[in-house]
């Protein structure tokens, strides 16, 4: 075995270990969403997380991977190869099947973000339809623009991004591609569904509908925090050599600092704003920090990471309140704010706080401009496709369960079983 073989083997093991950590985020999402919703819908919300991963695994393998990483002439969409990966060779020599698994768990993460925002009133059959479309089309196409060699990430001389901004769009681990796509789809889906029964009074004021188990939600957030150490550092896709081990260590640090700063910022903001520190908001604040740092965790300094996480934690509190009380969009778990708003925020802050090229480090506005255009195009794509999908389903066959089913719980009526007996 040569040194090169040993290096590729080590990199492969690291990539697959990171994929396992990201897969473990699925039970984190499931527990978090279940804890923030009512007990009568627990089996339904847990089931939807399994559905996302089952559909995602098969459809991304069969078609989505080709759309995302297949070759094309315009940089918009790759060519599907229907389960045949002979077309693809990883630049660093990593096994294609291992790389497929790594990308599959990211696709499933984006899909599962939506389930919490649409909780407690969505037809299970129609949620399955959504899950098919995000894994098959919505996520892979925007992913192609950035991670698949498409137009947004093209840093070659003469490319549109380099001629316009002097920089390509940068999203290291998915603040935009994974989280803002999921968050925007969650927001559009919640609008299409309408609020839960009893959420808003006749006067239009929002009424709290507490979740049933903060213990489950807190365990879910701990699992997500842990899984993020595969999500972000794993996106380096290599562990051998000094450059990679330094990069992984740096990303571990920036990821953790942003999470801690986000949680503390939300805790203090809720304490000042509402008179008491909110545990449920703080849990989401931790996730807000993690989401926000994901785009630039490789480029910002530790201080920059803490600043991004802290600001995301503050923004989260006001975003959740604004979406709930002003826009009257009922998002039971705050996914639109955590993943959508904070994903956008983190992507933009990368252009400001990147040590190399960031506006605040003397790099001008080129990098920031590239980030602005990138997040705009990605989220417009998610919003338009999501609107066509959700409002199309609503018009044709109905997206929401009947009033009686919603009142008595989806577990019994949709699945014939209850999570608690």
Per-range role (PLM):
Residues 1-421:
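Glycine- and aromatic-enriched membrane alpha-helices
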